[in-house]
């Protein structure tokens, strides 16, 4: 098969589109000789010679470099070197062609300046080679060259991505980076403009207008205007003053470039903020007069005019003779600046009317250009401020756990945003108190004002400990008490400012901006204050609005951090309380030792395998031994390797965590477990359920009412209790019972499931949760329809997981309601206990919630108990046990007992009706008893 031929042009085009592949290949397999050749071709002869010590291994390059340097030193000069040709036989490396631009920049001795980029390139290449040298494998023998293109590109992209800081702050900064760039149009040369002025004044004027119309940078635009005005009127020097402070009503004329010559470069050599800045008060001097009145001033001799101020001349030694001053207006006719031309050339000549006319024609264009540049600068400033606010939000979301860190971030952002010398944050001790008292203060000084910015960050807990604090406390307290911002442009003129404290501190305060910090509930939690703008100007309205918006986010962040600290302390208190309670809620070692050494009676002796077991036959200790016997009889101790001492401790702790309520107590839990044990052993369900399922239902029976408070789910919802808030209104108590069971199991020395495998443990905990939640009658009503249908159709399949789940749920409910299946005396006694507990709940509903309880909870209607029991049996109990008998006929004694007990309740009900008929008493209709109200 013939190999495909590659076209070099196609390869080059592909590499142009994928430079990262070329870079990756060069970094992996590039040779030093290749880089030497590249440097030789793209550098001067002297530059190649300078590289010789670092690249001594490349002898051919050294020879060619020597020839190149000889030619330069031989007197050919820069011009000759630039036009020299390679020597014959030397190939590409024999001679080094020089660019004419190098000649113009050569030194007087004829030697050329070597480019700095060569040095940097050499360092970069050396670093990359060092990385390759330190590798412990040979890349030539790897299969990287055979990797597909997608793999190479993916690796290159990952390398790029890994070089970026993996923080949200850097990602946000990259996303918010402005994509708007200032247009760059190179102006025509000054010599060309001078030529046009002499030969074509119209074209000269158009060139000046065109050059300023394309510039949106106010600094370079101002510089251009000065130079062009000098050219137009033949002035020796020129100054431009722009109006500032108009919005605040305190106008000032400011010039960042003063006395610019016509022969200076078109771009300023210094861009330092406030460099060469001169401020002229509004209405003062000739500049101020022109700005205030908008008149043109043309003075042949400045010293003859009383408005002239010669202070600048005294400072600079420059003598002002003639002077032409003219206002600059925007499109609305407002004065936005003043242009001043000084000393007409030739020296001593005054400015003419033609000069005035030319300036009057040119300055309107300058006004338009300045307005556009100012608008662009304002939009950029607003963009930067909006970006800073977004970055503040990012900072606040990143740090919400440490108050000191978040306040420090806030102050750093405030200094960056407002460009101030000092920033402080004070937090109130008590936001509810009418007395303003600060409990914490944080302070940060700008690095420009402090040699060590980190050491300038201070925190003090007591107010007396920051007596050296430089912020005026009276202003901060005023803001905290009124909630209104305070902006002081001149601190020493404000009566609220303590000048004496300022002098003692050594930090001179000029201007103060202080705003309140609010939380989400619109309560003042502190104040934020900034001092002294770096440019020396007072804080303006824009600064105040920005600072107030900034502090809104800061207030939320500080409030969240304070709340987190409070929650953290509350959690610590809760942890301590739980530790104390768990100590008192667990059984003692003496109790464990007692039952560990006790002889456990047999099942026959305890009669716990009897479906008609007497619920009141055992005392509290006997119920523990009976529970131990059930675990041993079902083989769970041996099967799951349950430590016997742990089992004793767990049972005793479970008993201790049942409250002393009338019915839902430890005895009820044991009786439910006993009935489950009897059904498993008597009806043969032990053969149907797995060992894990049996363990789950037995443990579930013992734990299904842990920490029951004697009230039902409806009461928790009505009273909006802590349990309802924690678990919601669906199966509130059942979720609490399960979580309480888990807490006991996780306590030290109580995990009876410790020796189960991870899968068995996971399955068991899921089954345990299902078993406990199944005792909620709301869930019973939801699932019993499915169970009844499966039973009636004979479609029960024990291999189907959902069928087994429903069956276990029905078993749990049958055991929970099992008192109705016991002999009449036992069943009636249990019914009276349940009713008494319900009456206590009804009393609480009436007294605490101001509600009228339903019939089953109303003590005043206790004579209706037989009727309510009949409804209870007919609607809830009887259908369930009838279905279970269809599943297993061995459970028929339970159904028979239910029927027998119903007959007893029917007799009592009929007797009540007879008594009521003999002595009729008006009674309100009784409401239907909801199943969930029963348990």
UniProtKB/Swiss-Prot annotation:
Residues 54-69 have a biased composition (Low complexity). GO terms for biological process: cAMP-mediated signaling; negative regulation of cAMP/PKA signal transduction; negative regulation of cGMP-mediated signaling. Isoform 1 is expressed in brain, heart, kidney and liver, but not in prostate. Isoform 2 is specifically expressed in testis. Isoform 3 is expressed in various tissues including brain, lung, skeletal muscle, spleen, testis and prostate. Its main location: cytoplasm. The keyword rRNA processing does not apply. SMART domains: GAF, HDc. Residues 588-912 form the PDEase domain. GO terms for cellular component: cytosol; perikaryon. A divalent metal cation 2 binds at residue 705. The modification Phosphoserine is found at residues 162-163, 239. SUPFAM superfamilies: GAF domain-like, HD-domain/PDEase-like. Its EC number is 3.1.4.35, 3.1.4.53. Belongs to the cyclic nucleotide phosphodiesterase family. Plays a role in signal transduction by regulating the intracellular concentration of cyclic nucleotides cAMP and cGMP. Catalyzes the hydrolysis of both cAMP and cGMP to 5'-AMP and 5'-GMP, respectively. This is Dual 3',5'-cyclic-AMP and -GMP phosphodiesterase 11A.
């Amino acid at each position: 098969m013939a190999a495909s031929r590659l076209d070099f042009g196609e390869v080059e085009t592909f590499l142009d589109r994928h430079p990262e592949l070329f870079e990756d290949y060069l970094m992996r397999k590039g040779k030093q000789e290749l880089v030497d050749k590249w440097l030789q071709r793209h550098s001067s002869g002297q530059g190649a010679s300078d590289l010789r010590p670092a690249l001594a291994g490349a002898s051919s390059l050294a020879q060619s470099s020597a020839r190149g340097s000889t030619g330069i030193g031989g007197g050919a000069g820069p011009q000759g070197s630039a036009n020299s040709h390679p020597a014959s036989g030397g190939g590409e490396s024999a001679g080094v062609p020089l660019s004419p631009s190098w000649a113009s920049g050569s030194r007087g001795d004829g030697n050329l300046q070597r480019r700095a980029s060569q040095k940097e390139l050499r360092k970069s290449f050396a670093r990359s080679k060092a990385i390759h040298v330190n590798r412990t494998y040979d890349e030539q023998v790897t299969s990287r060259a055979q990797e597909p293109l997608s793999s190479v590109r993916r690796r290159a992209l990952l390398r790029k991505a890994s070089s970026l800081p993996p923080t949200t702050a850097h990602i946000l900064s990259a996303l918010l980076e402005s994509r708007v760039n200032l247009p760059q149009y190179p102006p025509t040369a000054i010599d060309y403009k001078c030529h046009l002025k002499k030969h074509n004044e119209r074209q000269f004027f158009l060139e000046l207008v065109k050059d300023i119309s394309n510039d949106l940078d106010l600094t370079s635009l101002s510089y251009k205007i000065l130079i062009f005005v000098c050219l137009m009127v033949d002035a020796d020097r020129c100054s431009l003053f722009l109006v500032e402070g108009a919005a605040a009503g305190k106008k000032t004329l400011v010039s960042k470039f003063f006395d610019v010559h016509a022969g200076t470069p078109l771009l300023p050599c210094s861009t330092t903020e406030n460099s060469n800045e001169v401020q002229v008060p509004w209405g003062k001097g000739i500049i101020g007069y022109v700005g205030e009145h908008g008149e043109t001033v043309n003075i042949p001799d400045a010293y003859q005019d009383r408005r002239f101020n010669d202070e600048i001349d005294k400072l600079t030694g420059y003598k002002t003779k003639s002077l032409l001053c003219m206002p600059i207006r925007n499109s609305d006719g407002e004065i936005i600046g003043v242009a001043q031309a000084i000393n007409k050339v030739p020296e001593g000549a005054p400015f003419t009317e033609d000069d005035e006319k030319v300036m009057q024609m040119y300055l309107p264009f300058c006004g338009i250009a300045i307005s556009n540049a100012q608008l662009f600068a304002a939009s950029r400033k607003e963009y930067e401020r909006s970006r800073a606010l977004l970055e503040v939000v990012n900072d606040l979301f990143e740090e919400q756990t440490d108050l000191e860190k978040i306040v420090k971030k806030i102050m750093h952002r405030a200094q960056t945003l407002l460009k101030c010398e000092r920033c402080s944050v004070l937090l109130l001790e008590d936001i509810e108190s009418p007395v303003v008292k600060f409990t914490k203060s944080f302070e940060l000084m700008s690095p420009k004002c402090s040699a060590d910015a980190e050491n300038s960050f201070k925190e003090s807990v007591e107010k007396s400990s920051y007596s050296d604090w430089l912020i005026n406390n009276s202003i901060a307290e005023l803001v905290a008490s009124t909630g209104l911002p305070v902006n002081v442009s001149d601190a020493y003129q404000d009566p609220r400012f303590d000048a004496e404290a300022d002098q003692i501190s050594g930090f001179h305060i000029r201007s103060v901006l202080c705003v309140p910090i609010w939380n989400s509930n619109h309560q003042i939690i502190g104040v934020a204050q900034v001092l002294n703008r770096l440019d020396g100007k007072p804080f303006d309205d824009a600064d105040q609005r920005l600072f107030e918006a900034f502090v809104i986010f800061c207030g939320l962040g500080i409030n969240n951090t304070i709340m987190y600290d409070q929650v953290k302390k509350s959690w610590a208190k809760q942890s301590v309380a739980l530790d104390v309670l768990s100590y008192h809620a667990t059984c003692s070692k003496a109790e464990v030792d007692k039952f560990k050494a006790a002889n456990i009676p047999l099942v026959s002796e305890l009669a716990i395998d009897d479906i008609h077991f007497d619920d009141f036959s055992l005392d509290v200790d006997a119920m523990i031994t009976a529970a131990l016997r059930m675990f041993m009889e079902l083989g769970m101790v041996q099967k799951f390797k349950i430590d016997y001492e742990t089992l004793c401790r767990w049972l005793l702790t479970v008993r201790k965590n049942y409250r002393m309520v009338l019915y839902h107590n430890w005895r009820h839990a044991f009786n439910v477990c006993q009935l489950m044990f009897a059904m498993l052993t008597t009806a043969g369900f032990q053969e149907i359920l797995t060992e894990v399922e049996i363990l789950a239902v037995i443990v579930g029976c013992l734990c299904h009412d842990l920490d029951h408070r004697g009230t039902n789910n409806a009461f928790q919802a009505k009273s909006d209790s802590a349990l309802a808030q924690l678990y919601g209104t669906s199966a509130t108590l059942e979720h609490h019972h399960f979580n309480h069971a888990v807490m006991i199991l996780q306590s030290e020395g109580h995990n009876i499931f410790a020796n189960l495998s991870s899968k068995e443990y996971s399955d068991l905990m899921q089954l345990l949760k299902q078993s406990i939640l199944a005792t909620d009658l709301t869930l019973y009503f939801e699932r019993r329809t499915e169970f009844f249908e499966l039973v009636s159709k004979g479609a029960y399949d024990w291999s189907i997981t959902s069928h087994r789940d429903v069956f276990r749920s029905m078993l749990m409910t049958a055991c929970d309601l099992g008192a109705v299946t016991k002999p009449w005396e036992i069943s009636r006694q249990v019914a009276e206990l349940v009713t008494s507990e319900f009456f206590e709940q009804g009393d609480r509903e009436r007294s605490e919630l101001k509600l009228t309880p339903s019939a089953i909870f109303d003590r005043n209607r206790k004579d209706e108990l037989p009727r309510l029991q009949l409804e209870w049996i007919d609607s809830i109990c009887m259908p369930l046990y009838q279905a279970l008998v269809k599943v297993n006929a061995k459970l028929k004694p339970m159904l028979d007992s239910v029927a027998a007990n119903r007959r007893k309740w029917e007799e009592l009900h009929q007797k009540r009706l007879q008594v009521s008929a003999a002595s009729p008493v008006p009674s309100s209709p009784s409401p239907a008893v909801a199943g969930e109200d029963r348990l």
